Regions:
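PAPS-dependent sulfotransferase catalytic core
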Residues: 1-127
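PAPS-dependent sulfotransferases, especially Golgi type II membrane carbohydrate sulfotransferases
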Residues: 1-60, 208-219, 230-247, 254-343
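Short, charged/polar micro-motifs that form catalytic or ligand-binding hotspots
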Residues: 68-75, 139-143, 219, 223, ...
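A structural signal for short, well-ordered beta-strand segments and their strand-loop junctions
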Residues: 69-71, 83-86, 92-96, 139-141, ...
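PAPS-dependent sulfotransferase catalytic domain
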Residues: 99-113, 147-244, 249-274
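CE4/NodB-like, metal-dependent polysaccharide N-deacetylase domain
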Residues: 124-133, 231-237
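Short, surface-exposed connector motifs at secondary-structure boundaries
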Residues: 130-137, 241-246
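Glycine-rich phosphate-binding loop used to anchor ATP phosphates in small-molecule kinases
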Residues: 132-152
Length: 343
């Protein structure tokens, strides 16, 4: 078993943070899986464990460079973006590895008991996720439920140059509400749990006066969910600056995909060629449904959004109006010139 290879994907760790579980996968598994959790394709059949000391030995022998990260809010084409950047053998993309969600949950539990996530555990997890095949650049797109880990991932030791860089991807509140209405069943299943986790990770409720979450309807919960994440993104941008953070709106990505992909390629140092990115946009991943794998052109996406907006216009406008006092109290900084937060 060669744990220096990404063929042994980090799958988890025990409560002590000293035993790590690995699942045997292939390069194809990474390329075709929209999620590296229970939805991984195909499901791994072989698992092995290693101690923290063994992991340290593996990482000492690895020469992988720091990964680039895509942190995102919900329903903002992050999966589509990740597939557009997936170019074997130049890049290796990890989409929503379960172990980072597990690390965030572990961090949440420690924080509730006035503890802190051990730096060594975080270093081991990130080091194992950043293993690569040959000279591939690694891109990691965590689930947004792990966004509280962003400061720890980006932080740099005193006196050391900045290491990790990230893209912060989100969308306008208006477009989030449209997406929620397109995927109501999925949203109802995920949103309460995700929102509760995000609020635990943040001092948001100390800044914002809200009625009980149970009294809010789905769109109001969605608006709070969006604002809580954008509140965090404001903080991340202020703390780490343009050297480590590239802000990007879904609106700009969909409107100017080649320009957006080129900016990410340059910022993360992925080494992708202009022709590769052009092909991605004109006949590749950009024209496919990121999760279904079927053809899904931008025009179809736009038409569906317009249909939802026409059908639920009153509900959307009501939610935007309800959120206005909160936005005045804690403004959200647009990610780029394409993002109009309320339209």
């Amino acid at each position: 078993v060669n744990l220096a290879s990404p063929d042994w994907m980090l799958a988890g760790f025990d409560s002590t943070g000293e035993i790590f579980q690995f699942a045997q996968v292939s390069r194809q598994t990474y390329q075709q899986s929209s999620f590296l959790d229970h939805r991984i394709q195909p499901m791994p059949e072989r698992l092995v464990s290693a101690s923290g000391a063994e992991v340290d030995g593996v990482l000492t022998g690895c020469e992988s460079k720091p990964a680039g990260y895509i942190f995102h809010s919900a329903f903002c084409t992050s999966t589509l973006l990740s597939f557009c950047l997936d170019h074997q053998p130049k890049t290796l993309v990890l989409r929503e590895p379960m172990v980072l969600s597990r690390l965030a949950s572990h961090n949440r539990g420690l924080a509730s008991a006035d503890g802190a996530l051990p730096a060594l555990l975080r270093q081991r997890v990130l080091g194992l996720l950043e293993r690569s095949y040959a000279a591939e650049s690694v891109i990691i797109k965590p689930s947004n439920i792990a966004n509280a880990l962003i400061p720890g991932i980006l932080q740099t030791a005193p006196g050391q140059p900045a290491q990790r860089r990230c893209v912060l991807l989100s969308c306008s509140l208006y477009n989030l509400l449209v997406s929620i209405l397109k995927k109501t069943d999925e949203a109802r299943g995920l949103l309460p749990r995700f929102l509760a986790a995000l609020l635990k990770d943040s001092n948001y409720l100390q800044r914002v006066q809200l009625p009980s979450l149970e009294s809010l309807d789905l769109l109001q919960q969605s608006a709070v969910f969006w604002h809580c994440q954008r509140y965090l993104f404001n903080t991340i941008r202020a703390e780490f600056g343009a050297q480590q953070v590239l802000p990007l709106s879904m609106e700009f990505f969909l409107r100017e995909p080649l320009q957006a992909l080129t900016a990410i390629n340059d910022f993360l140092g992925l080494g992708l060629g202009v022709s590769e990115l052009e092909t991605t946009v004109t006949e590749g991943a950009f024209l496919q449904h990121a999760k279904a794998g079927t053809r899904y052109a931008p025009q179809q996406r736009q038409e569906e959004a317009e249909q939802v907006a026409r059908r639920y216009g009153r509900e959307i406008e009501s939610t935007l109006a309800w959120m206005q006092p909160t936005l005045r109290n804690i403004p959200v900084e647009p990610l780029d010139v394409a993002e109009n937060l309320l339209t």
